Each structure stands twice: as structure tokens, then as C-alpha cells.
């Protein structure tokens, strides 16, 4: 087992078929390809809205786990000043970028974009006006 103690702002890319769990006290943005498939090995004794235990998928998970995958670690990026644009993850399903106080950035509108604001504020300018986003907002 590989245990991490993440710090605020860390990015950790966990490829599909990698067993993982979150510890107490974490707030995360889980970014992934669109999928209706999650195999739970354990569910911390949580229950659904009706009070029933959620199903576990042990046999299915054991069939797809990548047993050769090594430990994952936070992605370390080089700080290039206050205004920076970093590609944190680039895989065949999505790209994750971190924009830190850029004066402006034009989105590629030929693909789906999600803007999340983990701290501070952001202003989106569109043909229809401006949208103000605050900490915790996404669009």
C-alpha cells in the first residue's frame, strides 16, 4: 500500500484500474472520463438514502485492477511566476490544466470545457456577457 499526505493544491493523477481511497478531511475535484462504471471494494459502511448498504463489486474489480501499476505521487510542476498556465495531466481521455492568475486565456470551444475555481475568483467573458465565479464554483 502506498500512502500519501497531500498538500493543498496538489494534483494526483490516478489512472483507471488503480485501487485508491481518500482519507478524512480532504476536499477533492475528481476529474475523469465520462463513465457509469465504479467498482467499490469497500464503502466505509456508508448507506444510501433508504438506509441500505451500497453494493460492493469485489469480483468485477479484481478482474480489471492493474496489478503492475506502481505507486502514484503528486504531480510536481515548476513555478514560472504568478501568471502561469500548466498542463497537469494529458491522457487519451482528457487534459487537465491549472491557470494561475493569467490575464486572459481563450478556451478551445471545439471540445468540452469545465472551469473550476478551487480558490480565489475568475471572470468568464462570453458573447452574452460576463460570469463571475468564486471559490468552489464551476461552470
Locate predicted features.
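C-terminal amphipathic alpha-helical segment
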Residues: 39-109
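Glycine- and acidic-residue-biased ligand/ion/polar-headgroup-sensing regions
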Residues: 1, 25, 100-129
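Ligand-binding loop in jelly-roll beta-barrel domains
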Residues: 17-38, 130, 134
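Short, glycine-/Ser/Thr-/acidic-enriched flexible segments
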Residues: 19, 36, 104, 119-122, ...
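Conserved active-site beta-strand-loop modules that form the wall/rim of enzyme catalytic pockets
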Residues: 11, 18-20, 26-30, 85-86, ...
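Short acidic-glycine-tyrosine-enriched beta hairpin
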Residues: 2-12, 126-139
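A generic structural signal for well-ordered coil/turn residues at beta-strand boundaries
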Residues: 8, 16, 25, 90-95, ...
Amino acid at each position: 500500500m502506498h500512502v500519501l499526505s497531500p498538500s493543498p493544491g496538489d494534483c494526483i493523477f490516478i489512472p483507471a484500474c488503480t485501487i485508491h481511497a481518500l482519507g478524512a478531511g480532504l476536499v477533492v475535484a475528481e476529474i475523469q472520463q465520462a463513465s457509469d462504471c465504479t467498482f467499490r471494494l469497500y464503502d466505509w459502511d456508508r448507506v444510501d438514502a433508504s438506509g441500505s448498504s451500497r453494493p460492493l463489486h469485489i469480483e468485477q474489480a479484481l478482474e480489471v485492477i492493474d496489478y503492475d501499476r506502481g505507486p502514484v505521487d503528486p504531480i510536481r510542476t515548476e513555478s514560472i511566476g504568478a501568471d502561469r498556465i500548466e498542463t497537469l495531466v494529458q491522457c487519451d481521455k482528457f487534459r487537465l490544466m491549472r491557470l494561475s492568475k493569467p490575464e486572459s486565456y481563450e478556451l478551445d470551444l471545439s471540445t468540452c470545457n469545465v472551469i473550476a475555481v478551487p480558490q480565489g475568483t475568475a471572470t468568464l467573458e462570453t458573447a452574452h456577457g460576463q460570469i463571475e465565479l468564486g471559490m468552489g464554483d464551476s461552470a
